[in-house]
Amino acid sequence: QDEQLVQQSWSHWDFGPGVEILAASSIGSSMFLLMRNADGSFMMRVNFTKHNTDWAEEPYQLHLDAKITFEIPPGSYSEDWYNTRVALLPYYGQRFRYGTIYAVEAGGAFHEFPEPAGGWPDGAPVLDFPGNLEGVRLFVGFSYEFLYEFSKFLIKKQDDAGGVSTEDAGRLQLRRAWVNYSNTGSFTVKVSNGASEFLYDVSGELLGRGLVGNPSLDTSQYRFPVNGNAVRNNVTIVSRQPTPLSIIGCGWEGTYMRRASGI
């Protein structure tokens, strides 16, 4: 409300195929999870904090699963192939067969490594970077899908007792909506009316304002069409990028036609 946080949402987490949660416990603002996949057991931590970085060199709060950091050691660069090769198994000590991997440099630029067909061979991902990156600090982790679905864009009214109800005596025809975001990278807006789905990509910093190699983050407003009956429309925000995503406001416009009036 007025771009101030007034309520948290309920969340659902999916840790992917073949992952079993053995135990979970919260300490302070962190949850520790004991998990198991086909290659062994391991522990993960989830932080319930905003604007939090795990290392001082982290360029921004990276949204990555199983996030680690290390410097690329000498001897990783091949002059013949003009690339730098890094094997992740020595750093993780745990095998991971599935998932797209992101490697982010301290300046904010990131490299994407899609999951190969059939998964990572032997659960030991090996990453090849163009050029010589020896001595460069990387932040590495697995991509995950962030998905937020807005509640229905309906007219709310408050009675004398302070209760809130939905105005449902007429038809609300939506025209457009918008989201306000702060210090945010790329994301996708999905609009579904039950019969068709429309995708609108937001690229982060506007074209012409960004610099190559710098984080593409922006604070702005994005407007998009939402046509049809408000009851049938669903609006969802989706992102698989490691960049921050902070939605601080939302609004909509439409035409309301009241079918009946009280006497």
Where are these regions (language model features)?
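Beta-sheet repeat architectures centered on beta-propellers
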Residues: 1-263
